[in-house]
Amino acid sequence: MDQETVGNVVLLAIVTLISVIQNGFFAHKVEHESKTQNGRSFQRTGTLAFERVYTANQNCVDAYPTFLVMLWSAGLLCSQVPAAFAGLMYLFVRQKYFVGYLGERRQSTPGYIFGKRIILFLFLMSLAGIFNYYLILFFGSDFENYIKTITTT
């Protein structure tokens, strides 16, 4: 890959790698809680603490593909910097959700709701990028400069 191409995706790649580390952390928590309860083997049933850790991890895993698609779509189609920032915010919120789910479940609700809003923001960025592509294609008008001006301020 040439330097310009790497420069266009490096922030997205960094956020993706951080998300992989976070997934590893969540999986480690599930494994640790399982071994604490069941000795050396992994079981899907156990105490309330294990059920909470396992459910929180599954909820995060279920939303992960959607997050990755929205992150990369928004970054490639619209603008890398705000997409990467939104991705970092999503990872922070997902961490808050995971930790909140381990305590009282109502503590996880703000993280869940804010995470949905971040996914919506990334979706709207992707739509703006697609809309801009068709504006250029049909009308020759490029709104990407306007979008970049708004997102860099």
Curated annotation (Swiss-Prot):
GO terms for molecular function: arachidonate binding; enzyme activator activity; glutathione peroxidase activity; glutathione transferase activity; leukotriene-C4 synthase activity. It comes from the Eukaryota. Residues 1-8, 78-80, 129-153 are lumenal. Residues 31-52, 103-107 are cytoplasmic. It is found in: Nucleus membrane; Endoplasmic reticulum membrane. InterPro entries: 5_LipOase_AP, FLAP/GST2/LTC4S_CS, MAPEG, MAPEG-like_dom_sf, Membr-assoc_MAPEG. The chain crosses the membrane at residues 9-30, 53-77, 81-102, 116-128. The keyword Cell division does not apply. Pfam families: MAPEG. SUPFAM superfamilies: MAPEG domain-like. Keywords: Endoplasmic reticulum, Leukotriene biosynthesis, Membrane, Nucleus, Transmembrane, Transmembrane helix. Its main location: nucleus. The keyword Nucleotide-binding does not apply. Residues 108-115 dip into the membrane without crossing it. GO terms for biological process: leukotriene biosynthetic process. GO terms for cellular component: endoplasmic reticulum; endoplasmic reticulum membrane; nuclear envelope; nuclear membrane. It is a multi-pass membrane protein. PANTHER family: ARACHIDONATE 5-LIPOXYGENASE-ACTIVATING PROTEIN, MICROSOMAL GLUTATHIONE S-TRANSFERASE. Required for leukotriene biosynthesis by ALOX5 (5-lipoxygenase). Anchors ALOX5 to the membrane. Binds arachidonic acid, and could play an essential role in the transfer of arachidonic acid to ALOX5. Binds to MK-886, a compound that blocks the biosynthesis of leukotrienes. Homotrimer. Interacts with LTC4S and ALOX5. The C-terminal part after residue 140 is mostly disordered. This is Arachidonate 5-lipoxygenase-activating protein. It comes from Equus caballus.
